[in-house]
A protein has these predicted regions:
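Alpha-helical transmembrane segments and membrane-interface helix-loop junctions
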Residues: 1-182
Length: 182
């Protein structure tokens, strides 16, 4: 029971909202990639300082951790746009078109609800760190609202991409689960 998936990348048609969200998700993907490159460069610099120059490092480890986590969160909408998340389509393949559509609406709705909750909680957490001017307890003492900003931004962009996916499916631009009619 194999289906043909057309979901290599989210379709936008000529819908301006979908095109805008796709552009935002792509920009987020590029930012995420840049953060990973920066983390690798900082790691190389840290290795050089510690093992070649026999010096101490202060900020590098913490910066790499924040960059890697931030890249993961900021990259969420881009991965969703490319359909890079894990997708098991055994159940959708076994359903007829009507039930497949209903299942897609249900799963996207549930995802939107869950990511909305994560967005709300992450915004509250970020705002608390900003309001109280929390700093890390390391020598570097980074203001934590800066790296924690990746939480609400990442979940917000991910939510926007999920909403765009729902809109594309409801408008008939995208097929449920990216499966051609089987």
């Amino acid at each position: 029971m194999a289906g043909q998936s057309s979901a290599a990348i989210a379709r936008t048609g000529n819908n301006p909202f979908l095109r805008f969200v796709a552009a935002l998700s792509t920009l987020a993907g590029w930012c995420s990639a840049a953060m990973i490159v920066a983390a690798v460069a900082i790691t190389c610099q840290m290795i050089f300082i510690r093992f070649v120059l026999n010096g101490s490092t202060i900020w590098q480890t913490e910066a790499v951790i924040y960059l890697a986590i931030g890249a993961t969160l900021i990259g969420l909408p881009y991965v969703q746009r490319l359909r890079g998340h894990v997708n098991v389509d055994l159940v959708p393949l076994a359903l007829n078109k009507r039930l497949r559509f209903a299942l897609a609406v249900f799963t996207l709705s549930l995802s939107i609800i869950m990511v909305s909750i994560m967005l709300w909680c992450s915004y509250e957490f970020w705002h608390l760190t900003w309001e109280r001017n929390w700093r890390s307890d390391t020598v570097w003492g980074v203001r934590l609202w800066i790296p924690y900003l990746a939480l609400p931004v990442g979940f917000g962009l991910f939510l926007l991409q999920l909403i765009a996916d729902m809109v594309a499916m409801l408008l008939g631009i995208e097929k449920p689960f990216g499966l051609e009619d089987v």
